[in-house]
Amino acid sequence: MKNIVFVLLISMVQPVLAQTKLEKALTNLENNYEQEKVYLLTDKSQYAAGDKMWFKSFVFDGYNRSALSTTLFVELYNADKKLIDWKTILLTNGEGSGDFQLKEDLPEQVYFVRAYTPYMTNFNDDFQIVKTIPVYNPNSKESLVISKSSDWSAKAFPEGGTFISGIPSKFAVRLSSKTSLPENWTGKVIDSQNPNVPITTFKSFDRNVASFTITPASGKKYQVIIQDNTGKNQTIDLPQVADSGLNLQVYSSKEGIKYTLKGANLKQQLQNYKIVGTINNHLAYKANINQLTNEATSLIPTKISNGANGILQLAIFDEQDNLVAQRLCFIKPGNLKIEKAEIIGQNIKHTPRSFNSIDLSPESYFKNYTVLVSEDDGTQNPEEENILSGLWLTGDFTTKIDSPAQYFSKSANTEALDALLISESWQRFDWNSLLSGSVPTIKTNSQPYLSYKIKPIKNGSMLINTPVSLVLRLGKNEPAINQFITDQNGYAYLNNINYDEPLDVSLFVNSENNKESGTDNLFVTVEPLVNPVAFKGNFPGTKYKLVKAGENKTLSPSISRAINTQKNTKKVENADVQIEEVKLVGKKQDPKEELDKQLSTGMFSSVNSTIFDFVNEDQHIAGSNNIFDWLQGRAAGLTFQRNNSGVNVPYIRNQQAKLYLDETATDPSMIASLPVNNIAMVKILKGAGLIGDAVLIYTMKGNMRSKSNEKETQKNNSSVIKGYDKPSEFLIETLDNDDPAKKIENDTRETLYWNPNLFDSDYVPPRIKFFNNDSAKQYKVLIISFDEDDNLLYDQEIFK
């Protein structure tokens, strides 16, 4: 038995030659196969129609949060692959959050949530996460039930992919089903020529897998008979026994990954065989066997992953760089690198609607937390999936795995995980394709945030290499003017848009010889450059089926509680609306007077004034070129005379009136160029104290909007960019209210607290705070965080 580490050291001093086929394949892998995956956390595993679905997304590049993408599309589909709703989510350090408001009339069925970055569309759709979400509706004519079908199939996988005569071989037996797998099952291995005498027997580790080891004989045909707990059985064939080849045996422990190679009837034994270990698309380990030997072993240290957990793919290549064996194994399966939250204080009560709090340490390396607090019903049902299984397992496989979270729980069976990985193959790349030089086609490159191209058309023609002005107004903020020059195709571009408020875009072209307005016959279209892509894959099978509902449809307690929570929310919201209406009716103040008080200050306030209100009244101003044109004939004693520049100048009592824009002295040309839709109020002062005769123009502030109901002809040069979807706010409030209109008889909330971004501030402890419902006696608290080095904090505790 030879030590490959020693052989590796000797091979390292050999002269550097031209790249071999394998070395080129490794370079190809490193440069072209970087890929992302998504884990999606939802606040509940099932919903009632009308619920709000809260979600938090984590995007990974390998086992670290991804820096590749800043945009995530999250889509909701029904069972017929019809798109119901979708969100564009802003990613910060690979994390983003949002919510779906489920409609009350959604039919009861299984829905699917798809989440992907634009960059992920370059690769197989099967790697885009599809989350199964059952939604219940008491008014639906059909009901979701768990299928009792026992339709499953089995397959046996030899370790390394080879089955060599005379060498002990480990097998994994894997069950699969479109619905549910049997709770437990057993099996036996037989020689087809002597079926009554089992060679070995085995029991399932879980619903997914089992394993056994046999030493095959040349010329023998072996079969496996599997029987589940209901009595159903199936017989499958093992692969044909080979007389020559290579056997790979792997054992993973906290010290590292030990592997053994055994050759049988090879021409040059294992000489010039190569062992390659990859983690995602990165080379982590490489060794060469330079001596004649039929058996070799070595220990791969955990430092290849810096001590982190993850999947290592071992691939064995012969002297001609042909792939002869491969195997997946987990690094440090019994020693998961998971941090726990540092809780420095808690105030937990069990009385209905009481206030509870949990304080986290402000001195931790972890600064931003995702926190979910739910009522725990005490059933102690294990999680089916979580961020651990998404990061280390299901995010990289397209096959269906039953309850993957079990492999990373406190009671996890490392043998079961190993058997599962024997039955899996790494499909994010194919070694034979790599060796042939195949490179994926990258049609969508990752880019920062959202981008748009703007196409102006004036008098029916594209504006090529033309200076234009873009006026950008974000939400309720003041507009900003930006100068652009269109390219040779007539486009201007807006890049790096990372807002979650609507962005108003208006484009203006410099007029020629002052003969034509910059917006006359000008049309503008805005086209997004970062777009969702139609789903081409297939939804996974589920354990649910639809049956015709009976006359008295029964609902589970959790769904009944969810529906009652919706009723409570509506009651409170309706009461708030009624109270607000009463306030508005009781106020009875003159809106014009209120606007004047809001905008006018000091010496500009005068009783002797004429006010035109454009915020609360429709002044039909849209057809006017400027405010001076509109004012003509509307105020007694106010006249206009055209100056040398052709601008109308206001006069009061045959004297030129002073002009003020937002109470700052200005000239007529400035006022004449002001867009009329930006004007909130015009005030005419006659003999007002220190000011005298004056015309005061006030522009829109904050959330003011023009009352004009007329269609504005100038809007052809404008468009609105939606940007990212802004997450709703999860309200933290008590339903314990003495107001009869808001009185809630039974608080049945399941989700008591949801915060996708809890963080500390100036060394103040991050505080988890929530109000109890009427029934909870204990709470399930989930805390997730990553530090700057992407170390994972995952803590789920029950507080009693």
What role is predicted for each listed range?
Residues 1-27, 360:
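Bacterial Sec-dependent N-terminal signal peptides
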Residues 52, 96-102:
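Ligand-binding face of N-terminal immunoglobulin V-set domains in extracellular IgSF glycoproteins
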Residues 42, 191, 279, 652-654, ...:
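Structural motif
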Residues 29-33, 48, 103-108, 117-183, ...:
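Surface-exposed, low-complexity/disordered segments
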Residues 19-36, 41, 47-48, 52-89, ...:
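Contiguous segments within soluble domain cores/interaction surfaces
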Residues 46, 76, 189, 226, ...:
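Short aromatic-centered micro-motifs
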Residues 647-686, 705-716:
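Periplasmic plug
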